[in-house]
From Swiss-Prot:
This is Protein GrpE. Pfam families: GrpE. Transmembrane segments: none annotated. GO terms for cellular component: cytoplasm. The keyword Chaperone applies. Participates actively in the response to hyperosmotic and heat shock by preventing the aggregation of stress-denatured proteins, in association with DnaK and GrpE. It is the nucleotide exchange factor for DnaK and may function as a thermosensor. Unfolded proteins bind initially to DnaJ; upon interaction with the DnaJ-bound protein, DnaK hydrolyzes its bound ATP, resulting in the formation of a stable complex. GrpE releases ADP from DnaK; ATP binding to DnaK triggers the release of the substrate protein, thus completing the reaction cycle. The lineage of its organism: Bacteria, Bacillati, Mycoplasmatota, Mollicutes, Acholeplasmatales. It comes from Acholeplasma laidlawii (strain PG-8A). Gene3D superfamilies: 3.90.20.20, Head domain of nucleotide exchange factor GrpE. Homodimer.
Length: 190
């Protein structure tokens, strides 16, 4: 009988081991499944970060390319600004009235040179801002003086004190102007 008892104990132990091993296999599978799910989530997150970084790099390249284009487009703006001073001085000289016929003959030639100079500036994108008689626009005009004139609409540019210029679509220098500011209430300057 002792052998039968030993066999019964061994059978009980193996059944107990089988039950434990089944439970541990389930736990292992559950842990492995959790680990797989965790790794899949991590891969998804890393892939998302990668795609975002890739998109940021693409946007950065596009922004740098756009800046290069803008830099090339406006590269001559400082040069054009410096040319405006001698151009305007030259224009004032040739527009100066004279009674001397010999001097007027020279001035005709100089006016032709000035017109060529102006044409070159315009071909490169430098354009004079129209101001005289226009409605005051703070974007392109700078009011230096104001005057009361009942015959002109309020806010009209009465006189250009210094010409303003655009380079392509940027302001090189605003036009310095005298504007009309008149109040109908009291007939005086505002």
């Amino acid at each position: 009988m002792a052998d039968k008892e030993k066999d019964a104990v061994i059978v009980d132990e193996t059944e107990h081991v089988d039950v434990d091993s089944k439970e541990s296999k389930k736990e292992k599978k559950t842990k492995q499944q959790q680990k797989i799910e965790f790794l899949e989530a991590e891969v998804k997150e890393l892939n998302d970060k990668y795609l975002r970084t890739l998109a940021e790099a693409e946007n950065f390249k596009k922004r740098i390319q756009a800046e290069k284009i803008m830099d090339r487009k406006y590269a001559a703006s400082s040069f054009a600004t410096e040319l405006l001073v001698p151009y305007e001085q030259f224009s004032k000289i040739v527009d100066f009235p004279s009674d001397n016929e010999l001097l007027n003959n020279f001035l005709i030639g100089f006016k032709m040179i000035r017109d060529q100079f102006k044409s070159v500036l315009e071909n490169e994108g430098v354009v004079e801002i129209k101001a005289l008689g226009e409605v005051f626009d703070a974007k392109v005009h700078h009011a230096i003086e104001k005057e009361s004139n009942k015959d002109k609409p309020n806010g009209t540019v009465l006189e250009v004190l210094q010409n303003g210029y655009l380079f392509k679509d940027r302001i090189l220098r605003p036009a310095m102007v005298k504007i009309n500011e008149w109040s109908e209430d009291n007939g005086e300057d505002k």
